[in-house]
Amino acid sequence: VNNELSDADRFFALVAAAQAGDIRLTSIQAGLLVAAELGIARDSRAFARKLGIAHSLVLRELNDLAAREGVLEIVKRDPRTMRVHYTLPPASAS
């Protein structure tokens, strides 16, 4: 029996864990956070393409997430392509 998780299995396990930690997160929002943390995708189009999700859905979820204080930061918006670059905020020194 192979005990190693595939990259996809690991990603979805982390998404589920993120949702368990914050019940307000949708699966797409949790995916955006995990993708940013793992360096899988740091812009909306890359995330949409890699997961096979419509870019418009990703943009809606990304904007909702960015509206929450301290969860995700919008770095740049490209008005021509609608691509939104994002990052996780720096970890607080608590």
Regions found by a protein language model. Give the residues of each.
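Short alpha-helical segments that sit at the start of domains
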Residues: 3-31
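Short, structured secondary-structure boundary patches
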Residues: 3-5, 12, 62, 77-82
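Short, cationic-aromatic polyanion-contact patches
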Residues: 18-26, 43, 73-94
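Short amphipathic alpha-helical interface segments
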Residues: 25-40, 45, 49
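Short loop/turn and capping residues at structural boundaries
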Residues: 46-47, 59, 76-77
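Short amphipathic alpha-helical interaction segments
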Residues: 53-68
